[in-house]
Amino acid sequence: MPSTGVTSLKPATLSELQGYLLNHKADVDLFRLRGPFDVATHKDHELRLSTTERIDADLYLSAPAEKAPLVILLHGDDSSKEDHAYQALHLATWGMHSLAVQLPKDGPWVGNGRTLARMVTFIHRQPEIIDSRIDVNKIILVGHSFGGAAVAIALAEGAPAAGGILLDPAGVGKDMPAFLRKIDKPVMLLGADERYSPVRDRRIFYEYIRSGIAEVSIRDASHEDAQFPLEPAPQEPGTDPAATEELQITFVSALTSAAFSLAHTGNVDFAWTSFSDAIKDGKFFDVLKK
């Protein structure tokens, strides 16, 4: 388990936590710590969308009895649901159920986006297939790299989600601008530092999504820092790790703030305000909002 520590907040309910966070100064660093709630983990939970279509996912259920948001996380190319396990767990400690899904890891990513849209529609209609405590009006989509493109495509295809969070997303071809122009839900883009870790066509997301999008880059972060498995990936002797835990924690804190913002306010403004000190300090840079 990463060494984040646990918040000193002790709300009795999700509503109490929500009230506290919305009535105090928004600060992304608060979310570097794990949240106050216990989490029940269900590995390899099978979602049966039809008699022929099944999706494997890991489910992280937050303890409160109230209805709560659902955050769905999608990996990128040549990656897996396990690469986002700690992010999903961390979100659930803050009162947001999480589902890390496994789709074909080599794409096609337009197809994965459409599968994601079908899955969200299915959950929206029948939340009890996961848990009766899911608030279907507060489903948030999160995707890393090409998974970020798939999230954008799902939103463009009309997935009934409250918004999306793109973790250092990469574009997937000439049709991306047309998909991006169709998005009418709020989006937060959390990018790595392009000086060290450029990805393909990241700039098109802010360029072509018409409105309701905000973007920040995390200084010195790599593309892999936008992932966060429960156990670090093995590395060759004498090589530097692809990801740094400190920067992974920075990513997960920004992700948690953005997910809370989208779920509980319907826009990115809470998260944007929470980033203000990090922007002033230069930890977050290349900031854009429209």
Regions found by a protein language model. Give the residues of each.
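N-terminal cap/lid segment of alpha/beta-hydrolase-fold proteins
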Residues: 5-66
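Hydrolases whose catalytic domains are alpha/beta-hydrolase-1, hotdog thioesterase
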Residues: 150-155, 175
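The feature captures the conserved acid-bearing segment of alpha/beta-hydrolase catalytic domains
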Residues: 162-225
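Alpha/beta-hydrolase-fold serine-hydrolase catalytic core, especially in secreted/extracellular enzymes
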Residues: 229-290
